[in-house]
Amino acid sequence: MASVSTHGNQEKSPHLPPLSKQSLLFCPKSKLHIHRGEIAKIIRECQEESFWKRALPFSLISMLVTQGLVHQGYLAANPRFGSLPKVALAGLLGFGLGKASYIRVCQSKFHSFEDQLRGAGFGPEHNRHCLLTCEDCKTRRGLSEKAGSQPSAS
């Protein structure tokens, strides 16, 4: 014999909190499509591209320029360590400036990805209101409007 469920046909997702724990601003449909794999891919691309396209070239160029300035006599070499401290500092500064100069490119990648997911629960405003019109959202919006329209007894 087949066992019969006493709970009926509930189609609750296992990853959604119960209705009593959800806020009025929660939209169940928007939580279903968080593309963590694609976000991780964009982060990895940004790290690799910023290193190879900006940080490494800036670092090498600044180190070569600094070594040239020390060799020409425009910068004094350290008596104990030679040109190493100045070249190392120039390399670190070039690396940092190269990474920082690539920030706008990464931001544009995230903005283009956000435009693809508009209304799917991505970005800083995804929890503020429900952009999708699901039945749960409609009933909650109706309940909150009724509760807010009752006059106080004061």
From Swiss-Prot:
Residues with PTM N6-acetyllysine: 41
Localization, UniProt: Endosome; Mitochondrion; Mitochondrion inner membrane
Protein name in the entry: OCIA domain-containing protein 2
GO cellular component term of the entry, any: mitochondrial inner membrane
Tissues in which the UniProt entry reports expression: Abundant in kidney, liver and brain.
Quaternary context: Interacts (via OCIA domain) with OCIAD1/ASRIJ and STAT3.
GO BP terms: response to bacterium
Keywords associated with the record: Acetylation, Endosome, Membrane, Mitochondrion, Mitochondrion inner membrane
Source superkingdom: Eukaryota
Organism of this sequence: Mus musculus (Mouse)
Function: Has an essential role in the assembly of mitochondrial respiratory chain complex III. Is also required for STAT3 activation and plays a role in cell migration.
OCIA domain mapped to chain residues: 1-120
